[in-house]
C-alpha cells in the first residue's frame, strides 16, 4: 500500500510567515518616490540595475534604486561600482534617512531585505541573470510586489512557473528588457499593483504545506 502523500512547497509557508510587524526602512515608508529593489544581487546584476535606473530616471525622475547584494564581502565592490556610475549614493549602515537627491541606496547590512521589500514598488530577484539559479521570489510576492528575474530560475522552478503563469513574475534577460518593464510599471501603477496582487494570491493559495505535512506525519504515526 502506497504511503506517498503530496503536500505543497513549505517555502510558501515560510514566505507567508514573514514578520508582518516589519514595516519601513530608513523612512522610505513615508516617501512618495517609486522604489525599485534589486534583492540578493550578484555580479553583473548591479550593473544591469544601474543601467536600468539611468534609463528609467529620464522618464521617472523620482525613482530610487535600492541594491541589496547577496554577499557582504561585495559591499565595497558594489559601492565603487555605484560611485563610478556618477550616481548619488547613500549607504544604509551609516544613514538615518534617504534624501530626495539620492539615486541609489546601497544596503550594506545583513538581514535587511525583508524590511526593504516593505518600502518597494517593484523588485528584481538576483542570482537569476547571474547563473546562480535565482533566489526566493516569494519574499517580494508576500509584499504584493511585481517581480522580475533573469532566465536562471532553476533553484525554484515550480514556484517561479506558478508566479509567471499568474502574471506576477516577469523574465528579463538584460537592461533593455528590465528598463521597458520598469518604465511600464512607473507609468501604470494599476498594472504593477495587479501583478503584485497576483503573486500574493499564488502565495495564499499554496500555503498550508507545513500544516498538511504535520497532519500526514501524525496520521502515519498513529
Regions inferred by a protein language model and the residue ranges of each:
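Nucleotide-activated sugar donor-binding and catalytic core shared by glycosyltransferases
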Residues: 1-222
Amino acid at each position: 500500500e502506497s504511503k506517498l502523500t503530496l503536500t505543497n512547497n513549505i517555502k510558501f509557508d515560510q514566505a507567508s510567515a514573514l514578520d508582518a510587524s516589519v514595516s519601513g526602512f530608513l523612512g522610505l515608508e513615508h516617501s512618495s518616490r517609486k522604489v525599485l529593489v534589486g534583492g540578493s544581487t550578484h555580479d553583473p546584476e548591479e550593473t544591469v540595475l544601474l543601467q536600468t535606473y539611468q534609463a528609467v530616471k529620464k522618464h521617472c525622475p523620482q525613482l530610487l534604486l535600492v541594491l541589496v547584494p547577496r554577499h557582504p564581502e561585495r559591499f565595497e565592490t558594489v559601492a565603487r561600482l555605484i560611485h563610478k556610475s556618477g550616481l548619488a549614493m547613500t549607504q544604509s549602515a551609516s544613514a538615518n534617512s534617504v534624501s530626495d537627491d539620492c539615486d541609489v541606496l546601497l544596503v550594506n547590512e545583513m538581514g535587511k531585505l525583508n524590511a526593504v521589500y516593505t518600502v518597494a514598488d517593484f523588485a528584481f530577484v538576483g542570482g537569476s541573470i547571474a547563473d546562480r539559479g535565482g533566489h526566493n521570489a516569494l519574499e517580494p510576492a508576500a509584499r504584493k510586489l511585481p517581480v522580475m528575474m533573469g532566465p536562471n530560475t532553476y533553484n525554484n522552478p515550480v514556484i517561479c512557473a506558478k508566479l509567471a503563469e499568474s502574471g506576477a513574475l516577469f523574465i528579463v534577460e538584460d537592461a533593455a528588457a528590465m528598463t521597458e518593464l520598469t518604465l511600464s510599471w512607473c507609468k501604470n501603477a494599476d498594472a504593477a499593483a495587479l501583478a503584485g496582487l497576483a503573486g500574493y494570491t499564488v502565495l495564499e493559495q499554496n500555503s498550508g504545506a507545513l500544516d498538511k505535512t504535520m497532519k500526514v506525519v501524525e496520521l502515519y504515526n498513529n
